[in-house]
Swiss-Prot record:
Transmembrane found in the keyword field: yes
Residues at the site labelled Transition state stabilizer: E141, K219
Domain of life of the source: Bacteria
Membrane-spanning segments: 16-36
Lineage of source species: Bacteria, Pseudomonadati, Chlamydiota, Chlamydiia, Chlamydiales
GO MF entries: Kdo transferase activity
Described purpose of this protein according to its UniProt entry: Involved in lipopolysaccharide (LPS) biosynthesis. Catalyzes the transfer of three 3-deoxy-D-manno-octulosonate (Kdo) residues from CMP-Kdo to lipid IV(A), the tetraacyldisaccharide-1,4'-bisphosphate precursor of lipid A. Thus generates the genus-specific LPS epitope of Chlamydia, composed of the trisaccharide alpha-Kdo-(2->8)-alpha-Kdo-(2->4)-alpha-Kdo.
Active site (record annotation): E70
Record-stated family: Belongs to the glycosyltransferase group 1 family. Glycosyltransferase 30 subfamily.
Protein name per its UniProtKB record: 3-deoxy-D-manno-octulosonic acid transferase
Topology with respect to the bilayer: Single-pass membrane protein
GO cellular component, one term: plasma membrane
Length: 437
């Protein structure tokens, strides 16, 4: 009885915190809505006024990823799931409109339903979960919402985290909740984790060890690509790049990265190098334009048909293209790695496209992976001492060195694909109808 009372108090406290966070964020949300037109289409679903409709019969599996990266890693999982369990209905949700847009492009053709995730206020999410009644809920990387989890468990669903990870800062917050007598993750049935570092972090939160399995990082998984050289030529032709031209791709760029790279780009284009600049957030394109214009760097926008036949820098102001574009590059930088608050993005996409990888010193979001990349010689970390232009120029002028990085990257990715097989085998053991058959 006492535990039940504590639980009710905590749920009320959780809802109050969500309301406070929403109120604090409201001015920024309204600004983005009015200036960039964001959130308008998803308001009804976010507030539970319109519920996702998943047609058909049969049990429902609900996959959830916070944003683009978490959603994309679900692709091979859903492909395998639909292949082996065709009688199940699939729902994919994301917290961001960009995540929903990418998910729609990828998963709707597979027969899945895609939706924004309703807000996790108990009064909203309870009715949504009750209507959909999922049999299995799979969270990508750990974007777990308490009321969502508890309502899913209340109706008898199995809940699972795949490719699980938790940052140091997040683990500190959850440890604080643990001291208050609440284990946030206790309703989750299982955790399939990226590495031993993540396992130790979850153990420190009081998660029983029998719920934790280290299956590896499935962001490393990519289906066999047998014609990368043809894709490379196709994209380079589309970009109007001469055969002997060098292309540097700056992926997932943030303001902190721009500060480091703008003077480098100035020097590179004087040496005849082309640069593809891909902002992490498309709505920040105007900021990129202003920076390039201020330094008198000629550029064009992808959305307006820009190519390298008349400008040395092309800014990609459309979403969902970065992973495809990497294949055209001679060298790729992954952004978010010059800001400790961001800690980097997907380091593996360039390797999967057989392009040499460089990144900045702040890789806290995937530090264990970055260390393994460096130890294997499959990636190069830019430091604060040697000028970036020296490192980049050396790599561009030495094809043998670049090729060595590519070969080590191929070995690394091939070895890491075993992670998907382990994850899939473990996931199947949690599928309700499968484990009882």
């Amino acid at each position: 009885m006492m535990l039940r009372g504590v639980h009710r108090i905590f749920k009320c406290f959780y809802d109050v915190v969500l309301v406070c966070a929403f109120v604090i964020a409201l001015p920024k949300l309204l600004y983005k809505m009015l200036v960039y037109g964001k959130y308008k289409k998803s308001l009804a679903v976010r507030f539970g006024l319109k519920k996702p409709h998943v047609p058909g019969e049969g049990p429902l599996v609900w996959f959830h990823g916070a944003s683009v990266g978490e959603v994309r890693l679900l692709l091979p999982v859903l492909e395998k799931f639909c292949e082996e369990f065709p009688g199940w209905r699939c729902l994919v949700t994301s917290c961001t409109e960009l995540g929903v847009q990418v998910a729609s492009q990828v998963f709707i053709p597979m027969g899945a339903t895609v939706s924004i995730l309703p807000l996790d206020f108990s009064i909203i999410i309870k009715s949504v979960v009750a209507k959909l009644r999922p049999s299995l809920v799979v969270f990508s990387e750990g974007d777990c919402w308490l009321n969502f989890i508890e309502e899913a468990k209340r109706i008898g669903a199995t809940t699972l985290v795949i490719n699980g990870r938790i940052s140091i800062d997040s683990s500190k917050r959850f440890k604080f909740l643990k001291r208050l007598g609440k284990n946030y993750f206790s309703p989750v049935d299982g955790f399939l984790l990226q590495d031993e570092v993540q396992k130790q972090r979850f153990l420190s939160l009081g998660i029983p060890e029998h719920k934790l399995q280290v299956t590896g990082n499935i962001k490393t998984y990519v289906a066999a690509q047998t014609a990368l050289h043809l894709e490379r030529e196709t994209w380079r032709d589309r970009l109007r790049l001469p055969t002997d031209s060098k292309l540097v791709i700056l992926g997932s760029m943030h303001r902190s990265d721009a500060g480091k790279w703008l003077p480098v780009v100035q020097k590179l284009i004087k040496e005849g190098v082309s640069v593809l600049w891909v902002p992490r957030h498309v709505e920040k394109t105007k900021d990129v334009e202003e920076s390039l214009h201020r330094l008198h760097i000629p550029y064009g926008l992808w959305s307006r048909g820009a190519n390298f036949s008349y400008v040395p820098v092309v800014v990609v102001d459309e979403i969902g293209l970065l992973k495809q574009l990497y294949v055209a590059g001679d060298l790729a930088f992954v952004g978010g790695t010059f800001d400790p608050k961001i800690g980097g993005h997907n380091l593996l996409e360039p390797l999967q496209c057989e392009v040499p990888l460089i990144f900045g010193p702040h890789i806290t979001s995937q530090s264990e992976l970055a260390q393994r990349l460096l130890l294997s010689g499959a990636g190069l970390c830019l430091d604060e001492i040697e000028p970036i232009i020296d490192t980049v120029s050396f790599l561009l002028n030495n094809q043998e060195v670049r090729e060595a990085y590519v070969q080590k990257g191929k070995v690394f990715v091939k070895a890491e694909t075993a992670s998907f097989d382990r994850t899939w085998r473990a996931l199947k053991s949690y599928i309700p109808l499968y484990k009882n058959s």
